[in-house]
Amino acid sequence: MSESSFSLYAGRGNPNWTATGPREAFHALGYFALDESRRVWTADNLGGTPERRGIGERFDSWVRRHPQLPGVELLAACVQYALARWAFDKDEFVHELADAVTGGTYPVPGRMLTHAEHIVRGYLGFEMFGTRPPKGDMSLFATEGAAAAMCYVFDSLVKNGILAKGDKVALMAPVFTPYVEVPELDAYGFEVVEVRASRSAGTGVRQWHYPREEVAKLADPAVRLVCAVNPGNPPSPVLGDRVAEQIKEIVATANPRLLIVTDDVYGTFVPGFHSLAADVPRNTLLVYSYSKHFGCTGWRLGVIGLHDDNVIDEMIADLPQERKDRLARRYRSLTPEPEKLRFIDRLVTDSRPVAPRHTAGLSLPQQAMMVLFSLFDLLEEGQAYKERVRQIVRQRLELLLEGARMKTADDDRRAGHYVELDLLAEAERVHGKEFADFLEKTYEPSDPVFRLAARTSVAAPPGGFDGPEWSVRISLADLDDMDCLKIGHHLGEVFREYVAEWTRSPSPRGPAGEAGHPGAAR
């Protein structure tokens, strides 16, 4: 079946909702910025650069004159909130916004705009750290999404001699496919150590937990770095306090220079989420993307966060002198004291060839959108939006399981953006181990996926991501409610076929003629 013949792809990760309010505010900001541009210079389709002096008062006047413009009320609320919380100079802040949305200049600083960094740091602190923020500050580098951020991190760690070919890099598996593939690229050649989650049977969809003995692999000082997606993808539980405490203990004792890369893109879907970047701040690079929460995959909005007091800067300072001299030559065009250049700033330079470093950094309109998403979230309207999208994925999971006649244990720590249905586990739960063995010996793990596609023209990819072979990965965020119900129903139909084939097979152990389950209507 060709890709074009599929009517629905059930594994794509981008959500089918968008945050409309911040986008309206963005466009309103654009109209204000264009008025400011024409104020400076007006000609046919030509304007000037917005002027800083007095722009704050002009913004207030502009808002009063355009009460009916969509987004203007939210834009004004965002600006007011930022001024009240961070005590920004009004002209400086409003000018940064107007200049950013116009997109007429390079990002300066290249790492992130000054006011934007304060605001995004505030957003991350609220959503990722909650009531237990780490002491000190975290510096940010705005990137073209989380995948780009991950590539920048690996590349810069290698260029700065923190990682080398053959080093051991751990992955908290199952994990997002690029985290599996990137360390194995010839350019890096890392030895991958899997820290594998186990699946407790529970009821229905299996629950994922990291056993102590698996997490203990990180205590080996030869393991230089560990990558985690928290909450997970595609199984979506958080790592949990027990795992976080074990990692903290490992860093405090056996492996104090273990580096942690945590991708927390799904954190906003879990009430009370707490990032490893708060638990182990000195060792952790926080990677975050706005794509899933705000429905903005196409915007490519991501960020890397690194605590100002971190072990990477210490490790660079402790490099052999010959290596430090070589790095000094690499970065000497940036600063008269290249040996003091922080890793977070090296990331920016390394994201481009050093010579055209002035092209580094996320585009200004992207940073303006990031700022408005962040400020929106910190307002009451943003918190109501957050609860609504959480309800959306919870409801879709319930409908999927209802259609399939499957069950899952209640877990308010599950993000629910994705779900991975372990079909072999469900077969064993309902019909016993002999039925599960029959499936495993008789069919390829991808067989239920192809049967589902043939029945429905729905492409539901295998679980993959180093997860169980006999699994189906469903993106609840990208499916309508009724699609979830229908996919669940057709999965049940597929299993009824398997049960019928099992009962017709030589010496079947199952009750002949039993209606299959999951999917068996009782």
Feature-to-residue mapping (PLM):
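Conserved N-terminal helix/loop that builds the PLP phosphate-binding region
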Residues: 1-76, 502-522
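Conserved PLP-binding active-site segment of the aspartate aminotransferase-like
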Residues: 11-12, 417-440, 455-489
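Active-site PLP attachment segment
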Residues: 16, 277-339, 473, 484
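Conserved glycine-rich beta-strand-loop-beta hairpin in the small C-terminal domain of fold type I
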Residues: 365-376, 383-401, 408-437
